[in-house]
């Protein structure tokens, strides 16, 4: 991600603990070393800096989104599994599971009634995503696949990516 932004002419800063410096990151990249899981330390480390674009890929997303209000022109967050009804709580629906394909506007677990058997982890992800969009209405949120790439055990996304890369634009769905 860092090198892709550099290739496109961005001036890049990365915020991380500094515990695992990568030789793949060029020297021109500013490193902001702090604990991204501690909002007070992160706020102090950011100071009054502003950014045209902030890509949040780890740390406490809800807190980081709040810290970046007024500091980031555009927020892109990456993380979490789907927070839609039926994901993580398949037996709460009939037929069981999340509908496939699922629209981006489908019901979230946080929109279910109090008696709905919600998976708490999935509910927390949904609460976080809702907070991101409330704080940054033009934000984009990208969810990680299970594992990305041709070596994953359950090739759920890769089979579709491979078709796109091969120029096969049609996909038969049930």
Which residues make up each language-model segment?
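N-terminal Rossmann/SDR dinucleotide-binding element
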Residues: 1-56, 67
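Residues at the starts of beta-strands that form the adenosine-phosphate
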Residues: 11-13, 73-74, 138
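Short aromatic-enriched loop/helix-cap "lid" or pocket-rim segments at secondary-structure transitions
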Residues: 25-27, 87-91, 152-155
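Conserved beta-strand scaffold positions in the cores of enzyme catalytic domains, especially
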Residues: 31, 75, 139-141
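NAD(P)-cofactor binding segment of oxidoreductase domains
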Residues: 47-108, 125-131
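Active-site Tyr-X1-5-Lys
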Residues: 105-141, 145, 156
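NAD(P)-dependent short-chain dehydrogenase/reductase
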Residues: 135-174
């Amino acid at each position: 991600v860092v090198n892709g932004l550099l290739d496109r002419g961005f001036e890049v800063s990365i915020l991380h603990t500094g515990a695992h410096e990568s030789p793949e990151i060029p020297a021109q990249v500013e490193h902001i070393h702090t604990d991204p899981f501690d909002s007070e330390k992160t706020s102090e480390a950011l100071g009054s800096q502003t950014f045209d674009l902030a890509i949040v890929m780890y740390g406490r997303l809800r807190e980081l989104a709040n810290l970046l209000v007024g500091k980031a022109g555009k927020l892109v967050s990456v993380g979490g599994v789907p927070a839609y009804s039926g994901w993580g709580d398949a037996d709460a629906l009939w037929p069981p599971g999340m509908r496939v394909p699922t629209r981006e506007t489908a019901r979230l677990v946080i929109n279910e009634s109090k008696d709905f058997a919600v998976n708490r982890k999935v509910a927390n992800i949904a609460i976080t995503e809702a907070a991101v969009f409330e704080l940054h209405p033009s934000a984009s949120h990208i969810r990680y696949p299970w594992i990305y790439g041709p070596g994953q055990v359950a090739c759920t996304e890769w089979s579709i990516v491979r078709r796109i890369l091969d120029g096969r634009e049609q996909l038969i769905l049930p």
